[in-house]
């Protein structure tokens, strides 16, 4: 009997069972009651100091933070003066993500309901000059049609309505959630499943948050290996960038904590495996992707790169292995340990970083470079998705790094027949040796890439709203990862002793919950709805007074309601 294969089968079965529904969400039965009981809103007496330490910026509190946005909208709904602005806000967001064939009808409804003085929800706070321009402008399905109205609405809400919110019970409820969000968390909150892969400093395994049942991927960075290989800088850079960037095309960081041996990053689990695995391992007799599938992934990578570059972050390690598929078949880019953040006023950086075969000529020559190196790597990635080999070596060819460097710097790329003229031309523009001529990030956007004929069938608005159906949907019964025995194990690191500076670094790294992903988890798994209990008479809820559900039970006739 092959015990290695048996171990993989058992581990895969446990992992798939824990996943439950393949979307990675949880059900009440998958929650650990002991840890679920710890997720309880505190009495207000514990939240008194939070208001003074909290940034009271409108956009952060009421738009960016998911729980903050929900509570602010719930507050607006309780006051008829604010309902028109609330409903206009929601309807514009609905219009922005609607299918093209539904947009004209939704646009007409917005004009009639909110901009007409006879409308049921007429918004009298809007500047009439702006209203006239919107009414007289084009109508239909174009993007940004109501952007001026949305900006004006948010400006209106950030004034008196926001100040009223700050004095309301709904803001006190937000403080309760912020207190809960700030509570310490460690490895005991997570249940580990099978190893999914291995990086330079440790393993990546599937894990489950015990209180909510939500599945994640846990990247474990061995402390001794980090110190021995001088990996502290890369680890903290990756954590800082993941904390800062929130994009559907980049993995999200939900938790950061330490154990005795590891620094742990708990991130979005991508159950579909990595693109390299799909290129070579899913159909070994027919490696590579059809062109439409490769184009779809390329479009999503472009959106992810744009989000990084708009935040002045050079990725430096784009390759199929770092592009992961989620449950639905959409991709996110991962592994930002080699990324570098350009300072304000700094346009370029320098340094040897990346994976052989994916590094741009200017980087290999030791020159300064900018975001353009990532678009060269995108060209290599697109080429490999279609051809099932890199552009600078034949499949299975062993090439010394010195020879590979020379090919990248000076040799032209040859394209097999699998490439259409459009995909070849696009690849050529990405693999341009001269970074000044290379297609890429210009004037703060990737619009020049989006306009390429290769993407004529892609609706970028729907792509970025997560509305398109991917060309490949992973099988819920399959684990898209190497067998456990093929992942390999790390050797023991000896002779490493930690000092005070190391301990301080570990403590800084282990910052606990990350606000936006944590709030999203509370909403997605139903915990927000379960705990967001209000009295029907509008008075202060019992949990704010420190009265438990059991203690409040005898007076339940006074009426309670749930709002999620």
Swiss-Prot record:
PROSITE patterns registered for this protein in UniProt: AGC_KINASE_CTER, PROTEIN_KINASE_ATP, PROTEIN_KINASE_DOM, PROTEIN_KINASE_ST, RGS
Region named Interaction with RCVRN: 1-15
GO biological process: apoptotic process; negative regulation of neuron apoptotic process; photoreceptor cell morphogenesis; positive regulation of phosphorylation; post-embryonic retina morphogenesis in camera-type eye; protein autophosphorylation; regulation of opsin-mediated signaling pathway; response to light stimulus
InterPro entries: AGC-kinase_C, GPCR_kinase, GRK1_dom, Kinase-like_dom_sf, Prot_kinase_dom, Protein_kinase_ATP_BS, RGS, RGS_sf
Residue numbers annotated as active site: 317 (proton acceptor)
Positions with a binding annotation for ATP: 196-204, 219
PTM comment text: Autophosphorylated, Ser-21 is a minor site of autophosphorylation compared to Ser-491 and Thr-492. Phosphorylation at Ser-21 is regulated by light and activated by cAMP. Farnesylation is required for full activity.
Main location per the UniProt record: membrane
Protein's recorded name: Rhodopsin kinase GRK1
Species for this entry: Mus musculus (Mouse)
């Amino acid at each position: 009997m092959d015990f290695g294969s048996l171990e993989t089968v058992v581990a895969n079965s446990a992992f798939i069972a824990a996943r439950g529904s393949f979307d990675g969400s949880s059900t009440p039965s998958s929650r650990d009651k002991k840890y679920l009981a710890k997720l309880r809103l505190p009495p207000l007496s514990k939240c008194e100091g939070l208001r003074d330490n909290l940034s009271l910026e409108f956009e952060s509190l009421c738009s960016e933070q998911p729980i903050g946005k929900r509570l602010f909208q719930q507050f607006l709904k309780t006051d008829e003066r604010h309902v028109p602005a609330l409903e206009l806000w929601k309807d514009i967001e609905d219009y922005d993500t609607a299918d093209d064939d539904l947009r004209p009808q939704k646009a007409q409804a917005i004009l009639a309901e909110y901009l007409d003085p006879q409308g049921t929800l007429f918004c009298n706070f809007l500047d009439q000059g702006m209203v006239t321009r919107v009414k007289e402008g084009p109508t239909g399905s174009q993007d940004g049609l109501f952007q001026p109205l949305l900006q004006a609405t948010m400006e209106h809400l950030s004034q008196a309505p926001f100040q009223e919110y700050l004095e309301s019970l709904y803001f006190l409820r937000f403080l309760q959630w912020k207190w809960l969000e700030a509570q310490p968390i460690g490895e005991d909150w997570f249940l580990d499943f099978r190893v999914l892969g291995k990086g330079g400093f440790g393993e990546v395994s599937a894990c489950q948050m015990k209180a909510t049942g939500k599945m994640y991927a846990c990247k474990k960075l061995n402390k001794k290996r980090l110190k021995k290989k001088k990996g502290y800088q890369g680890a903290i850079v990756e954590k800082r960038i993941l904390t800062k960037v929130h994009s559907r095309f980049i993995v999200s960081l939900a938790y950061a904590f330490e154990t005795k041996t590891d620094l742990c990053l708990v991130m979005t689990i991508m159950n579909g495996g990595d693109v390299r695995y799909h290129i070579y391992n899913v159909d070994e007799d027919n490696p590579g992707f059809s062109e439409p599938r490769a184009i779809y992934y390329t479009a999503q990578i472009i959106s992810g790169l744009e989000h990084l570059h708009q935040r002045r972050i050079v990725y430096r390690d784009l390759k199929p292995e770092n592009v992961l598929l989620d449950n639905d078949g959409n991709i996110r880019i991962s592994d930002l340990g080699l990324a570098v953040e350009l300072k304000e006023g700094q346009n370029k950086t320098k340094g040897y970083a990346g994976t052989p075969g994916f590094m741009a000529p200017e980087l290999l020559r030791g020159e300064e470079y900018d975001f353009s190196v990532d678009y060269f790597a995108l060209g290599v990635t697109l080429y490999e998705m279609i051809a099932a080999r890199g552009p600078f070596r034949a499949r299975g060819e062993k090439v010394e790094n010195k020879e590979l460097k020379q090919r990248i710097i000076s040799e032209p790329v040859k394209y097999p027949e699998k490439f259409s003229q459009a995909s070849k031309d696009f690849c050529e523009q990405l693999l341009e040796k001269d970074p000044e001529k290379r297609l890429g990030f210009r004037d703060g956007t990737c619009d020049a890439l989006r306009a390429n004929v290769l993407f004529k069938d892609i609706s970028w608005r729907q792509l970025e709203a997560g509305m398109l159906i991917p060309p490949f949907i992973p099988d819920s019964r399959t684990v898209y990862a190497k067998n456990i025995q093929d992942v390999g194990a790390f050797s023991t690191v000896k002779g490493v002793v930690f000092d005070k500076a190391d301990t301080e670094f570990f403590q800084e790294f282990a910052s606990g919950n990350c606000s936006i992903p944590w709030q999203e988890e509370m909403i997605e798994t139903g915990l927000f709805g379960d705990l967001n209990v209000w009295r029907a008479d509008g008075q202060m809820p019992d949990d704010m007074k420190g009265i438990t559900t059991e203690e409040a039970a005898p007076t339940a006739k006074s009426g309670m309601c749930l709002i999620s």
